[in-house]
């Protein structure tokens, strides 16, 4: 009898299924009754992204740069682009944590992950104090302007109108300068692209 082809095919099938069988055997051997060891996790391990704190606004670029430690910041012609913000692994939050964060001051620049991180706390508090100082200065300047207007009457209103016109004129000039620069930049890019395609054809 010729058993060689049958044995060879069985060995071939057995060795192809060997890695899965080994994994199944390992999972079966590490059951709850085997020395109290925990079974291996089935999902692949993903490294958690290190985050020093969470910003109240992602528009605050300085805060995002400070809080997200492993983001690679790339200079592009228009602005600085953060890579690595997409789909970070999130831990589940309880309702208690949600109420605590809502109860905290919403004007804070950011919220630190560790309470022992003193640099983070000073950074977040400094941002809050700066915003409060700015708002106080704006209020004080508005109060002084109101005082001047009440004393001078019609002259003050006229001065405010003239100042408003000057500001609008300056804004219009700055906008026209910006558009001129954008147009020049676009023309330079088009020229570069045409030059590159011209070089490739010859």
UniProtKB/Swiss-Prot annotation:
PROSITE patterns, alphabetically?
Answer: ENDOTHELIN
* Signal sequence extent: 1-25
**Chain residue ranges for the region called Endothelin-like:** 110-124
Per UniProt, subcellular location reads as:
Secreted
The record's gene field reads: EDN1
Q: Which residues form the propeptide?
A: 26-50, 74-202
Please give the family membership noted in the entry: Belongs to the endothelin/sarafotoxin family.
The name this protein carries in UniProt is: Endothelin-1
Is Nucleus among the key words of this record? no
Q: Which PANTHER family match?
A: ENDOTHELIN (PTHR13874), ENDOTHELIN-1 (PTHR13874:SF10)
SMART domains this protein is in? END
| Positions of region (Disordered) | 28-49, 135-155
Which keywords label this protein? Answer: Cleavage on pair of basic residues, Disulfide bond, Secreted, Signal, Vasoactive, Vasoconstrictor
Q: Which cysteines are joined by disulfide bonds?
A: 53-67, 55-63
Site (Cleavage) at 73-74
Gene Ontology terms: cellular component: cytoplasm; extracellular space
